[in-house]
Curated annotation (Swiss-Prot):
This is Probable RNA-binding protein EIF1AD. Belongs to the EIF1AD family. The lineage of its organism: Eukaryota, Metazoa, Chordata, Craniata, Vertebrata. Residues 14-89 form the S1-like domain. It is found in: Nucleus. The gene is eif1ad. GO terms for cellular component: nucleus. It comes from Xenopus tropicalis (Western clawed frog). Residues 120-134 have a biased composition (Polar residues). It holds the Pfam family eIF-1a. May play a role into cellular response to oxidative stress. May decrease cell proliferation.
Length: 179
């Protein structure tokens, strides 16, 4: 099988299939990638370990920090305790939440930010922040903010401040008065 055909089938499998975890599999969140196709993950209970990426996903599917995975446990592993079985995208996450298979440790607030529940007092750790963020977002929507726009990094960006432009206008008006 050629590389292009393999890539096509792997991508189709990951994006198209809706997989439910078996009793041995776990849903984990990616914390980072130390390298060599290993990913540091955290369970909903807070346990951290490394998960290896199988060869069928390597150079075909990319995993970034904050993504969710379904992993198969490896019994003989000391540091690497799991192997990635499936990558969960937003559609997969919504489906698992509707079916009640989503771990209670990972919750989503209205803004779509995934947070970890605070186990000490049983409330979300970002509950107070989410209401403050909602108020700020309401205020931000009233003003025009270009921070979300695409920035072309191939061009030199000159930043003019209002103070500089005012001082330039003053110096120009002084020069005009002298002439």
């Amino acid at each position: 099988m050629s590389k292009a055909t393999k890539r096509k089938h792997v991508v189709k499998e990951v994006l198209g299939d809706y997989v439910q975890p078996t009793e041995h599999q776990r849903i984990v969140k990616v914390l980072g990638s130390p390298g060599n196709n290993l990913h540091e993950v955290e369970t909903s209970e807070g346990e951290r370990f490394l998960a290896s990426m199988p060869t069928k996903f390597r150079k075909n599917i990319w995993i970034k920090r904050g993504d969710f995975l379904i992993v198969d446990p490896i019994a003989e592993g000391e540091k690497v305790k799991a192997e990635i079985a499936f990558i969960l995208y937003k559609d997969h996450q919504r489906l698992l939440q509707k079916e009640g298979l989503w771990p209670e440790g990972f919750t989503q607030d209205k803004t779509g930010v995934v947070t970890k529940e605070n186990e000490n007092n049983g409330i979300q750790s970002t509950e107070a922040l989410s209401t403050a963020q909602a108020k700020e977002q309401g205020e931000d929507s009233e003003t025009d903010d270009d921070s979300g726009l695409f920035v072309n990094t191939n061009r030199v960006h000159y930043e003019d401040s209002e103070e500089e432009s005012e001082s330039e206008e003053e110096s120009e008006s002084e020069e005009d008065e002298e002439n």
